[in-house]
Design a protein with these regions (language model features):
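Single conserved hydrophobic/aromatic residue that forms the stacking wall/gate
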Residues: 1-8, 13
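Helix-to-loop junctions at the C-terminal end of transmembrane segments
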Residues: 105-118, 205
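A late C-terminal transmembrane helix in Major Facilitator Superfamily
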Residues: 173-210
């Protein structure tokens, strides 16, 4: 249920970005006087995208960020039950707070970025928040239930901040004619990560983290090592976000400028 909620939140975010992209493409086509001409796929566009440093930074940030959220949510409820002693009847509700936060806050943050900009800085902030969340979850002695809930709320804020800044940033890095291809390549790389990281975490849990058996005979796990892995991935996302901000200054992507120019 939690994964479905997160996917639903992500679909809402991408739907908003799709509508914005459609308007941008229509405006660009009218300005160029080519609104009636059909855009054709070109392998040259793929080459141009792949040699653009901004593509790899956005793609890496995307895969690292989402790899810290979606795979974690698969066992968030059990983490709350086992480590924090939260009742299993409400653990799923608390674990679903990031999805609820994304639904409410993404339009708010998106509106701020449209008017004020600061996309690169917001991606930095969201990545730093991820580090804090997973690092505190990884500390064995911090097991008070209220801490777990506060961390879920912070995760929800981060899950709203980064996508609301990251997806519109793609439209600043690439010309309109390359946007569809760029998004497709980014989603392709993202899906590789969303396959690989859960596979890694599942292997680590079964190999090193079994702490006992439940009454029904299934395994109980100590999630310290997986949370350390997520913390490491979040640290990598922060490094990539820093590099993206540096690239923004070097290549003039204008990520810090508002999306809507007056």
């Amino acid at each position: 249920e939690i994964s479905c909620s997160l996917v639903g939140s992500e679909m809402c975010i991408r739907d908003r970005m799709d509508k914005k992209l459609d308007k941008q493409m229509e405006a660009a086509a009218i300005a160029a006087g080519t609104e009636d001409e059909e855009e054709k796929f070109s392998f040259k566009d793929v080459k141009n995208i792949l040699v653009n440093p901004g593509f790899w930074l956005i793609a890496l940030l995307c895969v690292l960020f989402y790899s810290c959220v979606f795979p974690f949510q698969k066992f968030a409820s059990e983490l709350m039950i086992i480590k924090y002693g939260i009742n299993e009847n409400v653990a799923g509700t608390f674990a679903g707070l990031p999805a609820l936060g994304a639904l409410i806050l993404t339009p708010v943050f998106g509106g701020f970025i449209d008017k004020r900009g600061k996309s690169a800085s917001i991606m930095l902030l969201g990545s730093a928040m991820l580090i804090c969340v997973h690092f505190i979850y990884a500390i064995p002695d911090i097991n008070y239930w209220l801490v777990a809930i506060v961390l879920m709320i912070i995760l929800g804020i981060a899950f709203s901040l980064v996508p609301s800044a990251m997806w519109p940033a793609v439209a600043k890095i690439f010309p309109v004619s390359q946007l569809g291809t760029a998004y497709a390549l980014i989603f392709f790389i993202q899906n590789i990560g969303l396959w690989g990281i859960p596979t890694l975490i599942g292997w680590v849990l079964d190999a090193y983290c079994i702490s006992g058996k439940k009454p029904d005979g299934t395994n109980m796990y100590d999630y310290t090592v997986p949370m350390c892995i997520f913390t490491g991935i979040a640290c990598l996302s922060l490094i990539v976000a820093l590099l993206l901000k540096k690239a923004d200054k070097k290549y003039g992507y204008k990520l810090e400028e508002p999306n809507i120019q007056k």
